[in-house]
């Protein structure tokens, strides 16, 4: 007889059954499909449109050429090329306005303000008990006002204390200065050329804005947001109520929505065709995890405007280096920022409501109204979700209460119907002391143990990388991700398979989802508390995660209604046990299966025929057409508890997998797919987005002296969050995928431990400055970076050969600063007859006049071939005043901690600043004596410090030979960036007695 005929119940292949092959294939396909979509969103920039498909009024070819011209050289505020860029921008603006005004009559009025009058004295506000830094700055901003159709028709800014009537306008800002070591293609050239295209777009016929639009080309952002601060002194700062800030903190890719002030203004970003960003970045600023700032903090914090911050965020290794140029970016990135700017600005200038024009509680700020905190994130870079944080809080509280309640009610219903197999060890037979084992506790603690072990292993790998090769994530973030994810899946699969081998359980899924439900419930509680008390919305993904987990868990509980009643199962099992016991005595006389009559089953039990052909009774199966007895069994030990399985038999009950509980044969075999689709896609999308955003933004923070362990720890924890939805099914996986992932893990682990962390495409940033002491003629070149790579770089510099570099702790974290004597700079052109010693150089002119009998002095400072100087004091001064400067109580220039440094910026070259300073008497330290007499506390009325001037122009070779040398001889994997506002700082010491 053929095998098929011998076993008429051979199962047919079910492509959606909860069996190894379908589970392995379907889960792999789902995870790969969604992960690939998430990766494509982050790695592929949407292509720029052709000229024919571009919006009317936008010329992308022209924008790219403008970017190439703008980035033709370094143009920091303190450089001659910065003046050239300023003049070029005025020319381009005038050309665009002239072209459109001549082309049609129905175009808006345009007013161009070349602001060479505004100035301001202010400070950094102080940190803790530290003295503050004071700043004096003179504006060279260019402000373009496009009058809206509903704007005040009068030129109100021409009147003394004139104020606009009607609704507030919209500000779009970008800064046209670069750092001294970067060409500024993305920081902030793309923002600047986007402003030029916005000017072109809104000045053609048919595109006239309803509300006035102000385009601010600000100068001086890189040196402490100076351009935005001095904009506060211009009349237009009182007109605008909303803003869009265009920035660059990377060197390409997609422009990310960095942060926003409120929900209402964020909704205009939904107009973008390719939105990109998450509220997670904005909360990073709130929590202080992101230290750098943009003009956003001035527009919102000082002026009270409501708006958005859009910025490039990667790769950080090119930020502020010579690779921030047009060659290392592309027109697609330019189009992404420009398209976002057009869509958002068009929405803002077309808005007819009054949300941004109501009174505010702070009288020092514009009447832009009060917004609500928001939650926002993109989906595959094609859709954008935005809603109020209060809404998230309300939904979270509702779900935190209702989800456990629903599961509790479902559990009660299961208990009432005698189908609550969860947490059930056995079932007593009515009227007897005999119990039947249900094995319902199998797998109860499997999930927390295995998930804890896998997470601990990934965290251990994070520690290992931090100790052995801490900066590998700088260039190989995907190798780190691959290592973490592959080891997580393999370890989880291996442990789950071992547990399933020794203690198989049909309740594995239900217990797994229950534990995940508990864990995510706790996470949502924490997230909800932070949202309510601190306004932190970064945990938004936990709400959706928990909601999906709840639904998947509920499905597992609802599945249990398909099981037989526990009492019925125990009764049927007991009958089977008695039949088997009665047959043991005659087993030797029992004929073989081939000798049995056709109505006798292969296990010695009579075939009762089709149950559909009999009248139903109390013992009839709830699911007709299914067997109601459990003929395959095993007798337990001497405990009096009996348990029945198919052990020792070749024919298994239909629906039972392996050696799982025999009562599980009626469980649906397809609901696992529903659970997978309910949970996995939303988790991959949201957690994958969070993970990529974190590692993309933070993978290269090591070069700034920040510990990279936080990046590895994030990868480890997010791996658990990302693949926890897979765990309820992972014990069904075949060995093929986990074995392949084990090989991936071994390969990536070896690579991550031994590979060199930097490359020409992902360079290590090292920071340069040269300091010259004009009193004794000495100079020192200083490089700041991380060890041992800093030493490797210095060893490659010819001028450092034969010298012992003096290394000290750097300004932050693990940074180290090393100095040596280098070739002298030539930032000031000397008379041909002058010798080349440093002493006679007259780079800085200064004069100090002390007021008799008072701790007051007037300091006049001027530097040759520069427009940036500063005063540093050994002891902070109490107050200072700059001749001819404006002050603004919104931007205080002093504090109780005193002022340790005063930075001076001028729009004119070789300007003379006049600074008046006041200082307190400084008590002599114990043990000191002013005149060598008896030790006593006397006052020292002197003030000492340095007069320093800065040079930042690096466009001509040979002006700063030390910088040229470092760039020429540093390894290819090193990028040179500025260490301070100036590349060269020259100083004189002074003492005022």
UniProtKB/Swiss-Prot annotation:
Subcellular location, record wording: Vacuole membrane
GO biological process: proteolysis
Gene3D superfamilies found in the cross-reference section: Zn peptidases (3.40.630.10)
GO cellular component, one term: vacuolar membrane
Gene Ontology MF term list: metal ion binding; metalloexopeptidase activity
Positions of the record's site feature: Transition state stabilizer: 319
Cofactor(s) in the UniProt record: Zn(2+)
Membrane topology note: Multi-pass membrane protein
Protein name: Vacuolar membrane protease
Species annotation: Paracoccidioides lutzii (strain ATCC MYA-826 / Pb01) (Paracoccidioides brasiliensis)
């Amino acid at each position: 007889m053929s095998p098929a005929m011998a076993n008429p119940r051979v199962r047919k292949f079910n492509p959606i059954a909860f069996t190894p092959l379908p589970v392995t294939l379907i889960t792999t396909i789902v995870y790969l499909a969604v992960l690939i979509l998430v990766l494509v969103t982050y790695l592929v920039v949407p292509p720029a449109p052709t000229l024919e498909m571009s919006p009317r009024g936008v010329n992308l070819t022209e924008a790219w050429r403008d970017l190439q011209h703008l980035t033709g050289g370094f143009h920091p505020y303190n450089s001659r090329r910065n003046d050239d860029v300023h003049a070029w921008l005025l020319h381009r603006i005038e050309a665009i306005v002239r072209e459109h005004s001549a082309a049609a009559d129905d175009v808006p009025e345009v007013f161009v303000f070349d602001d060479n009058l505004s100035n301001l004295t202010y400070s950094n506000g102080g940190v803790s008990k530290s003295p503050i830094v004071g700043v004096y700055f003179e504006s060279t901003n260019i402000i373009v006002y496009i009058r809206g159709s509903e704007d005040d028709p009068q030129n109100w800014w021409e009147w003394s204390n004139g104020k606009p009537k009607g609704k507030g306008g919209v500000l779009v800002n970008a800064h046209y200065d670069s750092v001294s070591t970067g060409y500024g293609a993305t920081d902030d050239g793309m923002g600047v050329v986007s402003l030029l295209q916005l000017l072109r777009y809104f000045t053609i016929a048919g595109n006239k804005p309803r509300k006035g639009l102000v385009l601010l080309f600000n100068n001086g952002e890189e040196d402490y947001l100076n351009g935005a601060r001095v904009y506060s002194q211009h009349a237009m700062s009182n007109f605008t109520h909303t803003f869009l800030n265009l920035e660059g903190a990377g060197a390409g890719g997609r422009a990310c929505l960095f942060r926003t002030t409120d929900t209402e203004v964020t909704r205009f970003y939904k107009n973008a065709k390719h939105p990109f960003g998450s509220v997670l970045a904005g909360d990073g600023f709130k929590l202080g995890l992101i230290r750098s700032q943009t003009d956003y903090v001035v527009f919102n914090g000082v002026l009270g405007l409501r708006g958005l911050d859009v910025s490039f965020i990667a790769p950080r290794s090119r930020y502020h280096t010579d690779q921030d140029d047009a060659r290392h970016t592309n027109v697609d990135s330019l189009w992404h920022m420009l398209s976002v700017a057009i869509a958002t600005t068009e929405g803002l200038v077309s808005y007819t409501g009054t949300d941004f024009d109501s009174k505010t509680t702070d009288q020092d700020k514009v009447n832009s109204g009060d917004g609500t905190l928001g939650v926002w994130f993109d989906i595959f870079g094609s859709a954008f979700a935005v809603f109020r944080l209060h809404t998230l809080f309300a939904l979270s509280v509702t779900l935190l209460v209702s989800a456990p309640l629903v599961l509790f009610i479902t559990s009660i219903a299961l208990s009432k119907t005698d189908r609550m197999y969860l947490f059930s060890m056995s079932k007593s037979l009515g009227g007897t002391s005999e119990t039947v084992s249900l094995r319902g506790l199998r797998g109860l603690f499997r999930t927390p143990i295995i998930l804890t072990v896998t997470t601990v292993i990934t965290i251990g790998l994070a520690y290992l990388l931090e100790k052995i090769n801490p900066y590998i994530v700088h260039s190989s973030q995907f190798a780190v991700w691959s290592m973490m994810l592959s080891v997580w899946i393999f370890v989880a699969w291996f442990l789950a398979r071992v547990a399933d081998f020794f203690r198989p359980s049909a309740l594995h899924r239900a217990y797994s989802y229950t534990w995940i439900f508990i864990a995510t419930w706790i996470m949502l509680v924490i997230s909800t508390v932070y949202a309510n008390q601190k306004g932190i919305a970064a945990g938004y993904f936990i709400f959706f995660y928990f909601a999906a987990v709840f639904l998947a868990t509920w499905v597992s509980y609802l599945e249990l209604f398909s099981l037989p009643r526990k009492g019925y199962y125990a009764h049927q099992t007991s009958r089977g046990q008695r039949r088997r016991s009665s047959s043991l005595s005659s087993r030797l006389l029992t004929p073989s299966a081939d000798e049995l009559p056709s109505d006798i089953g292969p296990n010695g039990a009579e075939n009762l025929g089709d149950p559909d052909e009999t009248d139903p009774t109390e013992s009839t199966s709830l699911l007709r057409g299914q067997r109601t007895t459990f003929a395959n069994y095993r007798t337990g030990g001497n405990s009096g508890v009996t348990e029945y399985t198919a052990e020792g038999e070749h024919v298994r009950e239909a629906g039972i997998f392996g050696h799982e509980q025999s009562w599980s044969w009626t469980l649906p075999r397809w609901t696992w797919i529903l659970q997978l689709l309910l949970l996995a896609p939303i988790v991959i999308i949201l957690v994958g987005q969070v993970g990529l955003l974190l590692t993309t933004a933070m993978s290269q923070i090591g070069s700034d002296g920040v510990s990279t362990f936080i990046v590895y720890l994030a990868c480890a924890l997010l791996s658990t969050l990302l693949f926890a939805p897979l765990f309820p099914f992972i014990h069904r996986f075949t060995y093929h995928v986990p074995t392949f992932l084990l090989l991936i893990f071994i390969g990536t682990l070896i690579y991550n431990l031994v590979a060199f962390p930097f490359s020409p495409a992902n360079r290590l940033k090292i920071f340069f400055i040269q300091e010259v002491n004009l009193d004794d003629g000495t100079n020192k070149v200083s490089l700041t970076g991380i060890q041992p790579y800093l030493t490797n770089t210095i060893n490659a510099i010819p001028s450092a050969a034969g010298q012992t570099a003096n290394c000290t702790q750097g300004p932050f974290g693990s940074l180290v600063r090393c100095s040596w004597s280098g070739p002298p700079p030539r930032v000031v052109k000397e008379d041909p007859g002058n010798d080349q010693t440093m002493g006679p150089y007259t780079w800085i002119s200064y004069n100090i006049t002390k007021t008799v009998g008072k701790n007051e002095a007037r300091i006049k400072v001027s530097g040759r071939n520069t427009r940036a100087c500063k005063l540093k004091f050994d002891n902070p001064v109490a107050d200072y005043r700059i001749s001819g400067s404006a002050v603004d109580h919104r931007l205080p220039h002093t504090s109780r901690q005193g002022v340790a440094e005063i930075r001076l910026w001028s729009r004119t070259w070789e300007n003379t600043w006049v600074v008046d300073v006041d200082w307190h008497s400084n008590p002599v330290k114990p043990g000191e004596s002013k005149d060598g007499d008896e030790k006593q506390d006397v006052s020292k009325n002197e003030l000492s410090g340095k007069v320093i001037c800065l040079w930042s122009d690096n466009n001509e070779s040979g002006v700063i030979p030390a910088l040229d040398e470092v760039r020429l001889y540093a390894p290819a994997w090193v990028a040179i960036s500025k260490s301070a506002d100036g590349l060269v700082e020259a100083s004189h010491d002074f003492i005022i007695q």
